């Protein structure tokens, strides 16, 4: 039986810059995953450019709930450390029909039909 995964990352959602276009792309990502009946949504890292604004958080929470109403969601924190763990924690607390898991450290995450090794890679500083 095939396993369908929908994956994106490095969104860098920013209220002051291309917000409408980025929001439209996110909406397409969610709707396409739902249409294809994916088994897991994965969003890895850099959801926003800096600490999220209320508008950015609200959009992400709405999107995560839509995804979780159709399949489990894995959120992996980014490699630049620009989004605060508090922003991601709020997303992980959102509720849907399926599980939402936040990964801030490397770990093996098990879902119903698959296990995923999530790894937060930090940017090297010189």
Task: Name what the model sees in each region.
Residues 1-22:
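Mobile, glycine- and charge-enriched loop segments
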Residues 11, 88-90, 117:
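Bulky hydrophobic/aromatic packing residues
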Residues 15-110:
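Core catalytic region of metal-dependent phosphoesterases/phosphodiesterases
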């Amino acid at each position: 039986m095939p396993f369908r995964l929908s994956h994106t990352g490095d969104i860098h959602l920013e209220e002051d810059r291309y917000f409408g276009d980025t929001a439209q792309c996110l909406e397409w990502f969610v709707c396409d995953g739902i249409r294809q009946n994916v088994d897991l949504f994965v969003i890895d890292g850099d959801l926003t450019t800096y600490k999220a604004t209320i508008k950015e958080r609200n959009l992400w929470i709405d999107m995560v709930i839509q995804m979780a109403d159709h399949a489990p969601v894995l959120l992996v924190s980014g490699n630049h450390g620009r989004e605060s763990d508090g922003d991601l924690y709020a997303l992980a607390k959102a509720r849907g029909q399926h599980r939402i898991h936040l990964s801030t450290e490397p770990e093996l995450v098990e879902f119903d039909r698959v296990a995923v090794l999530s790894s937060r890679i930090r940017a090297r500083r010189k």
